[in-house]
Each structure stands twice: as structure tokens, then as C-alpha cells.
């Protein structure tokens, strides 16, 4: 179980590096993450097989010779991601490609979080429309939700804005959406977004 968790974390980190630094070689990924070249190669091969990552141009060989590195990049067309965010005064849902480019969206301004059941009902209906507009559920690789509050291991521990306490919102949404769902606090995901765009890559935590 522990090895599976380590591999999953490495997979996530490798995807993040490729997204932020593409085009990037396997060696560069290994050096940036301090993960063994063998582990990087194994995970990258799986990502290529799944269609999430593709190989592109060749780099220059080192001065000592040897094989030229092959650069990696995210395949934007490999799938879609459903994203949603709740903030203090508004909320939005959108469909993005794997590089975060927004394709379709809905926004909700000036609403009260006191009406969460009604809001979730509205979001559910609009989400179904967006999924259909994007070509169907089979095109999606997953969904991500950003919320204010305390989130741990994909579980909402406390969100006063949403009126949630120790809530397994992930399970509820996965059943509703029929796709993997990732939930985290808004502050963390904002920082992660900057990381992916390269603005904060040299900073950790």
C-alpha cells in the first residue's frame, strides 16, 4: 500500500514538472524531483501509454556524446478536466483541457452560501450540460474542486462557508459525476496553479 502511495505521488509530481517545464527530458525530470532515472522512466512510459504524455523533439547530445535526450510534453487533447471553485462571493465551474485552457464555463455571482442545497442542485444540472457540450463523460479524466476551509486527504474537515464538517464530499461527487474527483483548499490550489505555470516552481510548500 505504501509503495502504491509513493508511486502515485511520484506520478503526480512528474506530471506537474512536465506541465510546468515542457518540453523537458526524462533526465531533467529525474534531477528536478530527485527521483531515480529508472522510476521516472517507468512512470513516464505508463503516462505515454495512457496518452497523457507524448514524446517530441530531440535535444542536443552532451559534449561527451551519447544518445540525444527526447523531450516530453503533455498531450492537451488526451482528455478534459471538469473544474469548480467556491469563493466567498461567487463560484464557477468550467471544462478545461489538460493544460488548463478553459473551453466552457458557468459562473455564479452574488449568491449566499446559506443556500448550498439549492446551489448544488443548480451546479449538478449545469455540470451535466457542460459535460454534454464537451462531448460526453468518456472524454474526461477527472474533476477538481477548490473550496475555502480545511481539507485533508481529499476530505472536507471544516468549511464554514459551505456549512460542511467532516464531510466526504469526494465520494458524493464521484458518485454523481462518475469520474475521479480531487478536492483541496483554495489557497493550496492557487499556489499549485502558479507552480504549473512556472511562477513558483523553485519554491516548495
Question: Where is each model-derived feature located?
Answer:
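Glycine-rich phosphate-binding loop and adjoining helix at the ATP-binding site
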Residues: 29, 105, 112-205
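Conserved phosphate-binding catalytic cores of ATP/NTP-utilizing and phosphoryl-transfer enzymes
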Residues: 55-79, 185-205
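Basic amphipathic alpha-helical segments that dock to polyanions
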Residues: 29, 40-53
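Extreme N-terminal segment that seeds HTH/winged-HTH DNA-binding domains in transcriptional regulators
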Residues: 1-26, 31
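Short beta-strand(s) of the beta-wing in winged-helix/HTH DNA-binding folds
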Residues: 25, 54-55
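Gly/Thr-rich phosphate-binding beta-strand-loop-beta motif of the actin/hexokinase/Hsp70
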Residues: 66-105
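Canonical helix-turn-helix DNA-binding module
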Residues: 35-46, 63-65
Amino acid at each position: 500500500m505504501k509503495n502504491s502511495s509513493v508511486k502515485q505521488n511520484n506520478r503526480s509530481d512528474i506530471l506537474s514538472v512536465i506541465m510546468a517545464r515542457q518540453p523537458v527530458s526524462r533526465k531533467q525530470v529525474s534531477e528536478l524531483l530527485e527521483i531515480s532515472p529508472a522510476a521516472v522512466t517507468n512512470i513516464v512510459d505508463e503516462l505515454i501509454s495512457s496518452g497523457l504524455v507524448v514524446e517530441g523533439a530531440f535535444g542536443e547530445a552532451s559534449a561527451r556524446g551519447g544518445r540525444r535526450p527526447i523531450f516530453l510534453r503533455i498531450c492537451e487533447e488526451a482528455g478534459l478536466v471538469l473544474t469548480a471553485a467556491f469563493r466567498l462571493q461567487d463560484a464557477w465551474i468550467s471544462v478545461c483541457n489538460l493544460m488548463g485552457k478553459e473551453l466552457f464555463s458557468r459562473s455564479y455571482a452574488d449568491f449566499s452560501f446559506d443556500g448550498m442545497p439549492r446551489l448544488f442542485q443548480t451546479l449538478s444540472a449545469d455540470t451535466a450540460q457542460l459535460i454534454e457540450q464537451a462531448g460526453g463523460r468518456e472524454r474526461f479524466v477527472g474533476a477538481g474542486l477548490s473550496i475555502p476551509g480545511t481539507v485533508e486527504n481529499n476530505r472536507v474537515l471544516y468549511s464554514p462557508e459551505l456549512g460542511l464538517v467532516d464531510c466526504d464530499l469526494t465520494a458524493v461527487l464521484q458518485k454523481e459525476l462518475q469520474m475521479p474527483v480531487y478536492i483541496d483548499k483554495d489557497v493550496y490550489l492557487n499556489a499549485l496553479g502558479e507552480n504549473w505555470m512556472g511562477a513558483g516552481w523553485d519554491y516548495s510548500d
